């Protein structure tokens, strides 16, 4: 059984027991969170597609940890001007473990 849900402006395909990194959620470590923006639920040969969301569809997960991703370097270079700007960015994330899928 798997589901596709929406969180943080992105869509994720998940199954029970899977861990994944999402955009930062305001939840404590160890807390349970529910995602009700479920786009698709598949159980074997039975597939339910929402328009846009599946009615009664829910994905539950447990917050494992919060953290920051790898550093990305951004360079803005101005040719022939002897000028450049260098910045770094580390995106916050929340790692969750999927505990249940219901439709």
UniProtKB/Swiss-Prot annotation:
GO terms for biological process: translation. This protein binds to 23S rRNA in the presence of protein L20. SUPFAM superfamilies: L21p-like (SSF141091). Belongs to the bacterial ribosomal protein bL21 family. Part of the 50S ribosomal subunit. Contacts protein L20. It comes from the Bacteria. InterPro entries: bL21-like, bL21-like_sf, Ribosomal_bL21, Ribosomal_bL21_CS. NCBIfam families: L21. One of its GO terms (molecular function) is structural constituent of ribosome. This is Large ribosomal subunit protein bL21. The lineage of its organism: Bacteria, Pseudomonadati, Pseudomonadota, Gammaproteobacteria, Vibrionales. Keywords: Ribonucleoprotein, Ribosomal protein, RNA-binding, rRNA-binding. It holds the Pfam family Ribosomal_L21p. The gene is rplU. GO terms for cellular component: cytoplasm; ribonucleoprotein complex; ribosome. HAMAP family: Ribosomal_bL21. PANTHER family: 50S RIBOSOMAL PROTEIN L21, LARGE RIBOSOMAL SUBUNIT PROTEIN BL21M. Coiled coil: none annotated.
């Amino acid at each position: 059984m798997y589901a596709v849900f929406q969180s943080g402006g992105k869509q994720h395909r998940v199954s029970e027991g899977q861990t994944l990194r999402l955009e930062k959620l305001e939840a404590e470590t160890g807390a349970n969170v529910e995602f009700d923006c479920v786009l698709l639920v598949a159980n074997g040969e039975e597939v339910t597609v929402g328009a846009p969301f599946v009615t009664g569809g829910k994905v539950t997960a447990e917050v494992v940890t919060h953290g920051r991703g790898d550093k990305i370097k951004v360079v803005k270079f101005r040719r022939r001007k002897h000028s450049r700007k260098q910045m770094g960015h580390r995106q916050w994330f929340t790692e969750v473990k999927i505990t249940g899928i219901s439709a």
